[in-house]
Structures are given as C-alpha cells and as structure tokens.
C-alpha cells in the first residue's frame, strides 16, 4: 500500500471551472465529519490542473492530514485532492477496506496521530507520520470477521442515536 500527499494547482481560482469536462476537486468541506464515503464535490478543476494536483480513484482511501487531521474516507469518485489530504493507494492488497476504515477511525490510531502531529504551529500529519503508526494486522479473513462484529454492534446501537 502506498501513501501520497495531495497537491493544489495555484492560484486555485484560475483552475476552478463549471465546465462539463471539469475534474472533481475533493475538499475537506465536501465530506461529513462522521461520513464514510466521498460521493460528490461542490467544485471542479480544469483538466490542466491534474498535473499540479493528485488524482484519486474510486476505492482509494483518503485521510485528512491537517487541522482536523486523521479522519478517514473512502472515495467513490474520480477526482483530485489538495495538500490537506493523504491518499492510501491499493489498501485492499492488505486490508479489508472496512477494517481499515474502522482502524483509522479508532481512538487507538487517532491518539498515535495526535502524538505524532504535535509540535508544529498547526497540527498535521505527513506520509512518514502515518507510515510509522503501529497497527495490528490480522489475516484478511479475520479482518472481515472483526468488521462483521463491529457492524452488528453498530446496528444494535443505531436505534438509540
């Protein structure tokens, strides 16, 4: 699995477009805080902005890396991300995608990110900080069983929310 940082074409206002050939410009404001999936964007960029940004594809895993850092999302769309995101490529090579989502959503991993992100003016994550997080990696079959149990508990809790 590879981790890459997003990038922004500058000045961004020169790249924003309403044209039908525009590329989804995925921003942190496009996602719900407690959401799981990225399904649409409010803005698009011109195709010329692709080479100055980072393309993401359906199934890529996105992680916020600044300000409200450490929030995971699964992209359901093609688009480009700015430097406030990290993209985790090909996570399904080693992870059940839902297991990775719950792992990255856990207090266990978030607390590691808090420690790693502190020390600068603005708390943020980078590729090295995310890559150095300590995780337990059970076999894929066991990951799927864990996900099934988590989702069973979530279904029991949801009526009370």
Tell me the role of every PLM-derived stretch.
Residues 1-9, 132, 136-161:
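Non-catalytic DNA-recognition/assembly elements of restriction-modification systems
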């Amino acid at each position: 699995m590879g981790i890459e940082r997003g990038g922004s074409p500058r000045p961004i206002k020169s790249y924003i477009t309403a044209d039908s050939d525009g590329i989804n410009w995925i921003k942190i404001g496009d996602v719900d805080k407690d959401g799981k999936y990225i399904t649409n964007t409010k803005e698009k960029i011109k195709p010329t902005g692709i080479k100055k940004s980072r393309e993401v594809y359906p199934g890529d895993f996105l992680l916020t890396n600044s300000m409200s850092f450490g929030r995971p999302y699964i992209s359901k769309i093609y688009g480009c991300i700015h430097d406030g995101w990290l993209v985790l490529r090909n996570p399904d090579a080693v992870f059940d995608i839902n297991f990775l989502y719950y792992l990255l959503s856990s207090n266990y991993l978030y607390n590691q990110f808090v420690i790693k992100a502190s020390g600068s003016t603005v708390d943020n994550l980078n590729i090295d900080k995310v890559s150095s997080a300590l995780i337990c990696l059970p076999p894929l079959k066991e990951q799927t069983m864990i996900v099934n149990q988590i989702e069973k508990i979530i279904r029991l809790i949801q009526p009370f929310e």
